[in-house]
């Protein structure tokens, strides 16, 4: 088994504006725009879901500003990732970033104890984070993973 890190440069205000709007038109627009991704999530996690608790339900909860199924926190996290990608673009070469910060999101969703591990950094913090990340020495979460373990 392996892990991957996906980093997105996204418009935080757009992501934040999705949460709690209670806008059925927005739900429908996002369902159409993210259909392939949401269906893929549902297929991948089919053994952990039932018909009421799926990626579409998590999306509706996010837009409606409610969390009906905290037991599938992982799904809220993956749907959040899809929303970030929808309003932004994926960036690469971010393999070690997940070790550097505690989980955070632009919207109040439950965070999984496992995966996905989410770190949302506002633009106003990017320069200080860049300085922090580039000043790290090997062994502090950078270049110290033993792939043979």
What are these regions, as identified by a protein language model?
Residues 1-148:
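Acidic (Asp/Glu-rich) sequence patches and key acidic residues
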């Amino acid at each position: 088994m392996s892990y991957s890190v996906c980093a997105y440069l996204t418009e935080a205000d757009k992501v934040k504006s999705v949460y709690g709007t209670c806008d059925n038109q927005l739900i429908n627009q996002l369902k159409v725009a993210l259909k392939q991704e949401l269906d893929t999530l549902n297929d991948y996690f089919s053994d952990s879901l039932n018909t009421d608790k799926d990626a579409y339900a998590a999306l509706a909860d996010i837009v409606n500003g409610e969390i009906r199924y905290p037991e599938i926190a992982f799904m809220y996290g993956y749907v959040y990732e899809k929303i970030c990608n929808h309003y932004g673009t994926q960036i690469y070469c971010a393999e070690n970033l997940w070790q550097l910060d505690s989980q955070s999101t632009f919207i109040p969703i439950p965070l999984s104890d496992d995966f996905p591990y989410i770190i949302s950094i506002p633009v106003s913090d990017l320069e200080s984070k860049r300085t922090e990340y580039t000043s790290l020495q090997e062994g502090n979460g950078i270049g110290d993973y033993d792939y043979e373990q």
